[in-house]
Amino acid sequence: MKHLLLTTIAAVLLVGTVFADPIHDAVNRGDLAGVQAELDKGANVNAKMWRRTPLHSATAGGHTEIAELLIDNGADVNANEDYGWTPLHLAAKYGHREVAELLIAKGADVNAKKKDGWTPLHLAALYGHTEIVELLITNGADVNAKTEEGATPLHEAAGWGHKEIVELLIARGVDVNAKNDLSFTPLDWAASVDEEDPPETKAAKREISDFLRKHGGKTGAELKALMPRLVQHGRFAFSFDAKEGKIYEVQDSFDLLNWETIRIYTGAGDTVRFDEDRDHDPPQWFYRVKMVE
């Protein structure tokens, strides 16, 4: 009997806390009056259930009025669940423009990153939500943000056949030849057609490939072939062969991650030679040259 009583008490405690939080239940039902009632009782507006706050749930469900009520009562617009999802990530994923506008107006970070580096813009580009892509960019979203695997929003839009978003990103100055960690560009992703893709997706990706080409897009292999070979002569003397009329940037780095352009040359069909013996803090150990036009 004692064991049964303890088990029953434990079950009641669980029902009243993590597994059945009344404010979460009201949010998930889309019950505005129910949410207000729980707030009037003193419910914790940032209480988490299954890693999410009530605002996460309101955003995922597209419940704009509930989201506004929660924010007005102290909900954290930039709250993270365990994997780094913020409410704005969810609005971007599910295409809830009104909620996204509300969150941004209330101070949501448009460049917040999940643990894998994904921003709201990556998700909007992946799922084809053009209006949200435009909203995010207008409010300062980084069009060249990269995930942990090096993918940009343009990779996602190109790879999933969202031509309008590709056009929008390029119009906003995205790097058309950004490479991910496997050295694939957005053009590589657009050109990669899955046999299971529906006909309209295949057609869209062909159009995207042509559009990227018209705007200077190249595959990773093509970019590698265009990369001039930088030859080192002694410690600080370098040279490379430059094609006539092409523009080259010489860059240096101390960690192979952060590169800075230190010289720009216009090729004349000959060998460019230069010395680089400036003092650096921190010291620069790596140099490269890339053709930009």
Task: Set out the residue ranges of the language-model regions.
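Conserved ankyrin/ankyrin-like repeat signature
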Residues: 34, 65-66, 98-99, 131-132, ...
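Short, composition-biased motifs enriched in small/polar/acidic residues
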Residues: 221-293
